[in-house]
Amino acid sequence: DSEFPCPRKQQPAGNSECSYYCEMNGQWKLGKFQNGARCDYNAVKDGVCNEGLCYASGDSASNTQNQGGSRRQENEDQGDDEWDRK
């Protein structure tokens, strides 16, 4: 998957995101957590991850109203534990 070149992995405990960044060959790339993981859509853990994006519970992946709030930008303040290096 060219949009998500990092390996798919399990969502860490306490994490409510659907995607993460990893370092590949000196560049930061996007990866996704497993489908079905709980995520924050509008509130705490009220959504479900599908292919790296967070959808409202009960919505399908084809829903065009996805807020896309699960993708963090690289420059957002987050601890080193959120990043994986390859």
From Swiss-Prot:
Biased composition (Polar residues): 59-70
Keywords: Blood coagulation cascade inhibiting toxin, Complement system impairing toxin, Disulfide bond, Hemostasis impairing toxin, Secreted, Toxin
Gene Ontology cellular component annotations, sorted alphabetically: extracellular region
One Pfam family this sequence matches: TSGP1
Tissue: Salivary gland (at protein level).
MF-aspect GO terms: toxin activity
Acidic residues bias (residue ranges): 76-86
Location of this chain's protein in the cell: Secreted
Chief location bin: secreted
Function in brief: Inhibits lectin and classical pathways of complement system activation in the host with no significant effect on the alternative pathway. Inhibits host extrinsic blood coagulation pathway but not the intrinsic cascade. Binds to neutral and negatively charged membranes in vitro; binding is reduced upon pre-incubation with Ca(2+).
Protein name: BaSO(4)-adsorbing protein 1
